[in-house]
Amino acid sequence: MAPQKPETFMLSTEAQQALPHDAQVALQQVDNLKYFLISAPVDWQPDQYIRRFLLPTGEYVSCVLWNNLFHISGTDIVRCLSFRFQAFGRPVKNSKKFEEGIFSDLRNLKSGTDASLEEPKSAFLDFLYKNNCIRTQKKQKVFYWYSVPHDRLFLDALERDLKREKMGQEATTVAVSEPALSFQYDSSQSLYEQLTKTQQANSSSFSAQQPAFPPGQSSSPVMRNMDAMPRPI
């Protein structure tokens, strides 16, 4: 059973299968990005410091090795999310306000545990700037690669806009195509909570369908949710 995706978990199986070809291609491109976000730090050459992924938008997202740790910039996180909203059928129309919301969420990721706080024009920021990973060399956090809950950030940004629309306010993104047009918002609980429950239900169903294995044998494949983590405090 395929894991539920943040972009389509609110749709029925029939609705997911009936998505237009363009929407299916776009969601496959999101899967390609997610694979990069999982696998980028693997199998580097001894003298390698950066690995890039070309988004369909024409922008690059970079995994950067610095001080023996893998990093991603806030700018690249926003690029990932902007692309995901576009692929979802809800492109960004107010970039400034959209970015402000993402960077506000990123404040939950703390220096030292989730990110490196870099002083203005540090050697690291200079490297990132020269490689188009950041737009400015002002003091900022650069995030540890696996500390960033990408799905959670997507859902929280989507929920903010859906709430704005429900209250008659201007959203930072606008639904123009599927699956966004068919996405039904239930405001009784957060989107992330709804996704987590759906994933847990599917995981339980998956486990119940698996044959029993003798001790010492593994029931592969093991299902793992990349962003199944509590909100950082």
Task: Tell where the protein language model's regions lie, with residue ranges.
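Proline/serine/threonine-rich intrinsically disordered activation/regulatory regions
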Residues: 1-75, 169-233
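Generic signal for short, ordered secondary-structure residues
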Residues: 12, 60, 64, 81, ...
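Homeobox/homeodomain signature
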Residues: 23-27, 88, 107, 124
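Beta-strand-rich binding-surface signature
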Residues: 27, 34, 47-52, 58-61, ...
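Charged/polar, solvent-exposed surface patches and flexible loops
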Residues: 28, 35, 39, 79, ...
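Short, amphipathic alpha-helical interface elements at domain boundaries
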Residues: 61-97
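Chromatin/DNA-recognition segments of nuclear transcriptional regulators
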Residues: 95-182
